[in-house]
Amino acid sequence: MFGLLSRFSNRPTARQVRTAALFVGEPATVDTTRTLDTILRAAVADDASDVHFEPKEDGLVVRFRLDGEMRDHTRLPLIQRDPLLARVKIFGGMDITEKRLPQDGRAKLDEDGKRIHLRLSSLPTVHGESLVLRLLDQTMPVKSFGELGFGPEASEALHAALTGPAGLIFLTGPTGSGKTTTLHAALHALDTSGRVVCTLEDPVEYQFEKIRQTEIREKIGLTFATGLRALLRQNPDIMLVGETRDAETAQLAIRAALTGHLVFSTLHTGDALAAIPRLRDLGVEMFLLAASLRLVAAQRLARKLCPACKAPHPENGRLAEQHGLSGAQFFTAVGCPACRGRGYRGRLAVHEVIPVEKFLPLIAANAPMAEVHALRAQLGYRTLRQHGLAVAAAGLTSLEEVLRVL
């Protein structure tokens, strides 16, 4: 073995290599290792979050997810397809003889001063197994709310909710919107000295000292609900529940908040206030929600414009007038060597953060959502769209990107 792959935690034995070669019917040459080494080096250098190996009838397509967008990396001939897929599965500790069922795997690597954990998943397709590798840089420091894109007012509201002794904090958004990263920022912002902090995550992506992290394993019955019920017997002060998926988890989270625990969790809703009817649909009594809820927030991830090459938008005047932002200066993506021609570098959170104290009477009375939204407008809390337009007007992202993520 050589290069980056020599530092894998799951390096294949000589016997595994020979077995893989016999199984796929190709010679056990070093070329497959070189190819995988090159692909992973490129993924690490590009800060890719995921690497996709997509089998086709005539070969294998490798794509990277960069700042949330899929980009083609390379295309390999048919002769390399099955040997490379087998090699990836070996490094992930997966069964190369099982191609009919989905599998999960794990590996670790050190590259360029980074300690990266990899989560692998396989899925049978008509042309072979699709493999996806999620790259998780364990050396990356936890970012503050400000570094994630939360403004001063939003950061202050989040910190105020975190200083309370108990209550529920819900973060909403679709898959891939950065909810887990923001929850980790919240845990990092807490003063955990003298307090027990526990998490239930699916899966555990980043590991933290002084925090007890539990990974959900639904195949053996360890769900969020069963985990949360057990967690309540562990004498915790602060709990992070990765997702509130069902009625039992929702009701247990409410119970935990009402009995003196600070609870963070996520929901899949379109905006922050939509968490209220979602929890009602899960069977939560509104008077109990009003007694426990402290803050709701929603977010999306937008790509940041590359500061080295962004340019004023050619239709700036029309766009500013169209969106009611007279005098705003919008920018557009161009592309340069600094951003590898993409026009964007990194991502930031487009968000809405709503402390619910003044909404509690309406929540307890199960008032129509029209009244809740009217109060929101009266109090001046910004919507996702309003914050997105403000971020674009500040030149941090493009208007096209804001409209794409919203």
Each model region followed by its residue ranges:
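Short, flexible helix-loop junctions that flank or precede catalytic/ligand sites
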Residues: M1-P12, T19-L406
